[in-house]
């Protein structure tokens, strides 16, 4: 039986980089699992330490829901693509682990499944965690540095003829040295057509793909309207969504209506006045609001590509972006910590906003406490609190 062709017929028309092979399969007992840092439909991501080398890694479990299905195609696609890509802002897979199923009978061989893990460098934070953590403040030079690195990574991906198709805050990671890593290539695909060029619009757009990609809250309007010959512009919308997330200090821009494909829906944008620039100018400044408007342009043909965005004045006006190594060390913050951070933020807000009693009432209460502490409750206090006891 031949293995599945994850790139369809792309090898005939697109230059594909050779895949670096894994030297060998590791074993799970070679690692000390520390804690869970992520969870989703794919399985669980755990922080672990290599017992021999001592370095921290992330173990991503690949769930296979049925032994009859074989190796998950999304996982195979992600691993294959990541082995082809080599860029400082793209997460690397350093190895694989396969845990054999525990079989006691021949029937178990059919029903039981082995478990695969990918081994990647440990990333101390993702942007959902950083945005939700009340103890973390991402200032303008820091966010410019993060955004610049994100755009450099996306530009590299697009120049290699790939669509990521799931750019969102949870898939943008930060290592302890301040280097951004783009992760989760399970939805990535090779695209056909021209590459993105400065001032020339997006790349691709020559083949049909499913429109059911990109997490819905980050999904661009062309996908909501059912477009199938989409371009690299779908990834750029996700960059703009992240920028609004930072501006609001939240992990998402809010749910958008999932439009039907009826023709009347296409007139919605023609009857509404665009307010994005005026709404975000106080938060991002003139150049930031202008960049955001270029990233969130409704027409994908006019939307900025990564090269255009990197050339924008936002990155050359003060305050300028700092270097990755200048980003201060943050508390470990991941998407899985989001609910804990929300509770912490709510608790902090409640403590800081407890209504204060009126001064006269507070003084009366203080005098009451002083009388009680006197022992017999009869001797009034002296000094500033020696006022008429109007509380009797």
Protein language model features and the residues they cover:
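A conserved loop-to-beta-strand element in the N-lobe of protein kinase catalytic cores
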Residues: 101-121, 128-129
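Glycine-rich ATP phosphate-binding loop
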Residues: 44-64
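Activation segment signature within eukaryotic-like protein kinase domains
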Residues: 146-147
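Conserved HxN/HPN-centered segment at the entrance to the catalytic loop
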Residues: 86-97, 106
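C-terminal lobe substrate-recognition/regulatory segment of protein kinase catalytic domains
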Residues: 246-291
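Catalytic-loop of the protein kinase fold
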Residues: 158-175
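C-terminal intrinsically disordered, low-complexity extensions immediately downstream
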Residues: 320-391
């Amino acid at each position: 039986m031949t293995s599945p062709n994850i790139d369809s017929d792309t090898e005939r028309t697109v230059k594909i980089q050779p895949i670096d092979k894994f030297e060998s399969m590791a074993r799970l007992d070679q690692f000390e699992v520390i804690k869970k840092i992520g969870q989703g439909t794919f399985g669980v991501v755990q922080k672990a330490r290599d017992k021999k080398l001592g370095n921290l890694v992330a173990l991503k479990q690949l769930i296979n829901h049925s032994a009859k299905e074989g190796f998950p195609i999304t996982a195979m696609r992600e691993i294959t693509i990541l082995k082809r890509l080599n860029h400082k802002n793209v997460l690397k897979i350093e190895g694989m682990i396969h845990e054999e199923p525990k079989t006691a009978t021949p029937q178990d061989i059919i029903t039981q499944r082995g478990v695969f893990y990918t081994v990647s460098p440990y990333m101390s934070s993702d942007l959902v965690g950083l945005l939700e953590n009340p103890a973390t403040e991402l200032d303008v030079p820091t966010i410019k540095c993060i955004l610049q690195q994100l755009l450099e990574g996306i530009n590299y991906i697009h120049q290699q003829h790939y669509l990521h198709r799931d750019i969102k805050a949870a898939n943008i990671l930060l290592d302890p040295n301040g280097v951004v890593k783009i992760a989760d290539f399970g939805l990535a695909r090779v695209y056909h057509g021209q590459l993105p060029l400065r001032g020339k619009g997006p790349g691709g757009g020559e083949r049909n793909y499913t429109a059911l990609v990109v997490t819905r809250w980050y999904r661009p309007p062309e996908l909501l309207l059912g477009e199938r010959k989409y371009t690299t512009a779908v990834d750029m919308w996700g960059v703009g969504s992240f920028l609004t997330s930072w501006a609001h200090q939240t992990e998402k821009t809010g749910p958008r209506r999932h439009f039907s494909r009826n023709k009347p829906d296409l007139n919605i944008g023609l009857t509404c006045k665009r307010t994005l620039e005026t709404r975000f100018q106080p938060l991002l400044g003139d150049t930031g609001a202008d960049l955001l408007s270029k990233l969130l342009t409704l027409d994908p043909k006019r939307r900025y590509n990564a090269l255009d965005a990197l050339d924008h004045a936002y990155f050359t006006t003060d305050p300028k972006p700092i270097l990755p190594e200048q980003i201060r060390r943050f508390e470990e913050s991941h998407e899985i910590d989001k609910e804990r951070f929300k509770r912490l933020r709510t608790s902090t807000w409640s403590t800081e906003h407890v209504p204060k009693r009126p001064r006269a009432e507070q003084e009366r209460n203080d005098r009451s406490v002083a009388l009680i502490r006197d022992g017999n409750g009869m001797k009034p206090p002296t000094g500033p609190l020696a006022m008429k006891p109007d509380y009797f």
